[in-house]
Amino acid sequence: MAWLELPRDKAGFVRRECPRCQRSFKTRPSRHDAGMLQRLLAGYFPFENLHEAYTAEELPSWHCLYCGHRALPDAWLTPDQSAHVEHMARAWANHVRYEQLAYVQRTLSHNPRPTFVSVAPEPLPRPLPPDEEELRTLPMVCCGEEVQASWEWDLPMVCPRCGAHHGGLSGRQQVHLEFVRE
């Protein structure tokens, strides 16, 4: 049985990338990730029942942590994640096609002269490796969730789930201290 999920880091966060500013951040996996992956897979499967896939109206929009851009969940995949989902979908489609053709060979008593030969597909691709990059963990008090942001980012942030604005450094004020000679 094949399994498809977005790779997580050691703390359980999933990398996201903004389609507008191209910056990456991490969030906890969402209950909508499965629907988003199903919607993407359905687009690549030529024999999928598209009416059974999640629609854009059923999936919430998410926001970029940095620039506030709003988009559907499937827009937040990194290029590696997107390529992996496409590769996995095409591999699954080849396996389904093979099983449909191999059925004829298994039932040769009904048709002793098949006009084709089914060729076994390549094995399904391995899962993506876990994400190893460490980012700074910050609380989003609006939703009670945590996100991971770039260490260099100290400007205001936007909650990826609800779009609430948070001050730089997660609401803490920056204090500039200077030494004064006496």
Q: Would you name each region that the model predicts?
A:
Residues M1-D9, L40, A75-E132, Q173-E182:
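Short, intrinsically disordered terminal segments enriched in charged and Pro/Gly residues
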Residues M1-F25:
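Short, extreme N-terminal segment that most often corresponds to the first beta-strand
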Residues D9-F13, E58-W62, E133-T137, W153-D154:
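Flanking scaffold residues of small Cys/His-coordinated metal-binding clusters
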Residues L40-F45, E57-R70, W153-H165:
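Cysteine-rich micro-motifs
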Residues L124-V141, V147-W151:
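Conserved binding-pocket/active-site segment within a compact domain
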